[in-house]
Each structure stands twice: as C-alpha cells, then as structure tokens.
C-alpha cells in the first residue's frame, strides 16, 4: 500500500490520459492497468460541463483524478490553473508542471519551487514534476510537497531511466514518496525504477501510443508489481568478478 497525503493506493502504477485514440480506449487501458490515479491536463477539460465527456469514463471507473498544470510557463500561470482546477473538479490534488520550452518540455526548477511553496500554503496536495535533481527534490519536500515526481528522461521520449544515478540519490534521501515520471517507454523501464526503490511510476505515452494499449497497460501493471516485489525481496549485490553458484571442485574429493 502506498499513502500520499490523505489517500492510500494499492496500485503503484499511475497513468496519464493523453494520446489515446479515443476516450473508450483510454478508459479500458486505465482499467486494465489497475491504476487508481490518473492525471489530466486542465486544458483538456470542459469546466463548463458537469459531466465532461473525457472525465466521465475515469470517474465512473472510480479512479482518482490528478489535474495537472501542463502548459503553464511560470509560477503565476500554474497557480491560476491550480485554483481553476480545484474549483472545477473539486479536488485539491495537483500535479504541478511548469515547462516554458515547448520543444524539450524541461521543467523550470525556479518557477516550480516558487509555485509549490505558494500552492502548499493555499491548501493543495502538490506533486511537482521536476528534474532528477536531488537538491531541488529536497527543497520541494521542505516546502511541503506531498511527493516528488523526478523525470526518468524527457517527456514522451521513451528513453527509460536515463537519470538513474540521480534518482538513486533522490530515493535514498527522500522522506516523501518518489514517483518516477516521464520517459518510461517500456515495462522493463518501470520495473527498473521500482527495483531502485521508487514508490510509484507514472506512465502515459508508452501505453497510449502502443499498438495495443490495453495489453500494454497490463504489461506495465505486472512490471510494476514485479519490480516492487524484487525491491522488497532484496536484490543480490553487484560484484566485479564471477562468483560460482555451486562448488566447482568439492565434488571431486567425494
């Protein structure tokens, strides 16, 4: 079980809602993944409708919504979007995203920290998307973020855990859950993140853009479970030389 702020999750696989061919496929994939938390950009939600066409399948499945501020270019934009999301969706949970560069979508660390500090004061449960920067993640924790979401690799790149060395430090020193977000392109990437000790992973593109999203969602579900189980079981340490798994010569003396 994973507890973040006031919610407890059985699944450690969080999902995104973008890039699916249609809303029905999105809902089916999320259900197959077992995910209990799905993030959605506020700009995709019709806040004037009480039963938004995109949101409803997720709500009907009992999945928690995590609105995000994708598209915000600075702290001011993100704070405005956050309050709009809370009013429209009735949740104080927020995935904080600030990436002013439209090409690489790198999160702005200065604006993210500034926005996070204010949003926590405003009563939000803040989950910030950020660089795999151990110092920044500690600062975000110190201002009251409920979890941190460092990137594995650039958004949508499917490059996997490119920031492994830094993620290991973040995981080691964190006192809040660490959710590896962005760049996870295969179930094996998700398993690796979990084996490292990450508390959860968030996956979108790898599921939505696959040829069979529902089957891929199941694959990610199993990978996350396997990775977590391996971490708890205790992985055998790495060594620089060969170590025989059985005696090489003792049987000759028998």
From Swiss-Prot:
Q: Which residues form the signal peptide?
A: none
InterPro entries in the cross-refs? Aldolase_TIM, Thiazole_synthase_ThiG, ThiG
What family does this belong to? Belongs to the ThiG family.
Q: Which EC class, in a word?
A: transferase
Q: What is this protein called?
A: Thiazole synthase
Q: Has the keyword Cytoplasm been applied to this entry?
A: yes
Q: What is its EC number?
A: 2.8.1.10
Its recorded reaction(s) are: [ThiS sulfur-carrier protein]-C-terminal-Gly-aminoethanethioate + 2-iminoacetate + 1-deoxy-D-xylulose 5-phosphate = [ThiS sulfur-carrier protein]-C-terminal Gly-Gly + 2-[(2R,5Z)-2-carboxy-4-methylthiazol-5(2H)-ylidene]ethyl phosphate + 2 H2O + H(+)
Q: In which pathway does it act?
A: Cofactor biosynthesis; thiamine diphosphate biosynthesis
Q: Which GO terms describe its molecular function?
A: thiazole synthase activity
Q: Which residue positions are annotated as catalytic?
A: 95 (schiff-base intermediate with dxp)
Q: Does the keyword Cytoplasm apply?
A: yes
The record's keywords, sorted A to Z, are: Cytoplasm, Schiff base, Thiamine biosynthesis, Transferase
Localization terms from the record = Cytoplasm
A Pfam family cross-referenced in the UniProt record is: ThiG
Q: What is said about its interaction partners and assembly?
A: Homotetramer. Forms heterodimers with either ThiH or ThiS.
GO CC annotations? cytoplasm
Q: Which gene encodes it?
A: thiG
Give the organism the record lists: Vibrio atlanticus (strain LGP32)
Q: Which GO terms describe its biological process?
A: thiamine diphosphate biosynthetic process
Q: What HAMAP family does this protein map onto?
A: ThiG
Query: What is known about what this protein does?
Result: Catalyzes the rearrangement of 1-deoxy-D-xylulose 5-phosphate (DXP) to produce the thiazole phosphate moiety of thiamine. Sulfur is provided by the thiocarboxylate moiety of the carrier protein ThiS. In vitro, sulfur can be provided by H(2)S.
